[in-house]
Amino acid sequence: MTMNAIVVATSLLSASLAATPALAAQTSPLINTAAGGAPTSQRQVITSSEQLPRRVVKLDKLPSQYLEAPRAEVLALADTLEKNLRDDLARFDIQDAATMRGYIGSLLTLAQYKGDWAAVPGLVAQLKALQDKPGPRATTGTMATIVAEQQTGKRDAAWVQDEVRKRYSAMNWTDVADGVKSFKGQMELLNPALVKGSFEQQIDVMARNMQMSVPEAIVGTIVGARLQNELVVPLKAAVVNGLQAVIDAREKAGNATKRDIWTPRLFTIAPNARASEVGVGIWDSGVDLALFKPTAGRGIAFDREVRPSKDLLRPLGDSQANWPQLKTLLKGAMDLQAALDTEDARRLKQAVATLKPEQVKQFQEELGLAGLYTHGTHVAGIAVEGNPFARVYTATMLWEHRSEPVKPTEELSRRTAEAYKQIVQSFKDQKLRVVNMSWRYGASAYEGMLAWHNVGANPEERKQLARQLFAIERDALRQAIASAPEILFVAGSGNEDNSADFEEYIPAGFNLPNLLTVGAVDKAGEETSFSTFGKTVVLHANGFEVESLLPGGDRVKFSGTSMASPQVANLAAKLFALKPELTVAQVREVILKGAERQGRVNLIHPRKSAELLGLRL
């Protein structure tokens, strides 16, 4: 199963393919119902994404050809999509805010493309009402509103730049700083060639495989790309300059940096402390064990088809020669997200700006490969930071990085299930105390993979097959974790700002006594805009711009719940090292007891948890 690797370069590039993130939401959020919809009591209650309908749309031409097709052809697709979305809202009482944000955000994109500017304020208001994080609530719909006013008032780019500066300057900087900087980075990477190349080399391939009957979401992607190319790209410089003016003014005023409440909570174990070695498992995409003290067994690995492999660190293959450049691009992406004008950031912008459509697939796949190559080592560095007694064991999954997914089959899922059992057994054999899992997936991932390969007679059949395959792996993973009560497993919740419960993520959605699921905050202790939530998300830790190791030893900052969960694994490993007699239940209890609750956030406090055990730091 593929992993949602936390590689900001990839996410920044992908943002340019989303349904106009610059216009719709930048982040999107319960609306009452579609106009004319049935009363709530008469609508079907939806508590899981599995309950929602799946649809396909028959295209008359390749998706890429719609990028330059007559507007009337795209409007016909948009009308069909809008009718289906409004029918769903009339029929279903959807209990998940993130899913509702998707619906309303799509309607907003459609309204903008159709030029229905009068509908924009109401849709923006509905999105804001669905957003429970202060930063996204403040920024949601800002650009959609500006563009609507620009279009109706026939304003020029200079007006847009000034409005961007004024409206973002009026926001609470503590709430919106990270989002504004990230949004500026997304805008700087806008490139129509990137969109065209992604369509031609990836989306068109899927459409051909599916004999032109594509998932309905592809229509939204087409409309979003047209809207982006026609309305957003011409305003790129104005928006970037306006946002930069806001950032510059905040830095000049001295309030550009948030207060750091995270670092003072941390503690380090001295090399001469009275402590015992503790085995820490990193179940991930591979670890450069040369950077760490490994356990005796070192690790176990499985390839893209879940067959045993000897590669504990993912090979770069033909991309090895490009590693220095890829490393620069990864660093540049992080600098761009932080709105830093560095040489690495400039190189990334130059690389994206000069991309030709035929180069996009290789470029994106190499970045994806680099992400998987670096992810596990970065996670491991966080998990053992400040703990000289930690010994690392890697469980390496060589997930697919190419755009063409592995074809899901029952045989593959049963091999995956068996691999999960073997991996956990290896943890037991190595007597590990803590295992970090910075990955998750749900049944919907298999639906997309099955669709790519045109497996299943229709979307509903694909949905059922996906759930059957997913259930094989879900049950095996749950049983494997439950079979090791002496090991504390720690999982990242996800980076989709959605409900792990609604999406049925594993392992994040498991409720087991030896598992902790972790969401992400920044150094100020504020929930990040991307962090997934849910009933099983019981702890939070810093997952924003966390510095750690890359293979080879360089250090870089990554963001994601992938960076938050190893912070909890780090604390657990330190407690086990200092008091090896502790049980999983005791460590779990003291971590939870030491955490500080503020609304939905339950932020760990490593020092407090240690002190609750009587440890003198």
Give the location of each predicted region.
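Extracellular S/T/G-rich loop segment that most often corresponds to the catalytic His/Ser-adjacent loop
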Residues: 486, 492, 500-577, 581
